[in-house]
Amino acid sequence: MQRYPDIEIYLSQVPLDALNAWLGEQLDAEPLAPAGKHKWRTRGRIDGEEIPILLVEKAADGFGSLWLDSPDTPWESDQACARAAAARLGCEVRCSLGGWQPGDDPDRFLQVLPDGVEREIDWPDSGH
């Protein structure tokens, strides 16, 4: 499997303390710092490679968007990161089904629950 150029997952809850601890463990990241209304930023580092991190609270239907802007993460894909986040943070996590191509349904996502249950869902963008 080819590594994703970046990682984006959606968290049903944004427990900042737990999220900061997880990002620190996985990416050697400093705690997230406020970066505007409902936005938080930090940077992680793996093997000397810097990883910009952006959290946007309530990005989509109340879910927070966590974006890791680098291919140099511990996870090859959004799905792998979503599984790790759901297990560690104890919340529902959603992500794309894979690399998006023209003609793909943009509303299809993978839902990962804290107990490891996964399913494909329709998640249309409501604009909220």
Predicted regions: what is each one?
Residues 1-22:
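Short, extreme N-terminal segment that most often corresponds to the first beta-strand
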Residues 18-28, 81-84:
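Short amphipathic alpha-helices in soluble, non-transmembrane regions
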Residues 31-75:
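Short, intrinsically disordered low-complexity segments
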Residues 71-78, 82-87:
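Long, charged/polar, surface-exposed segments that mediate recognition or autoinhibition
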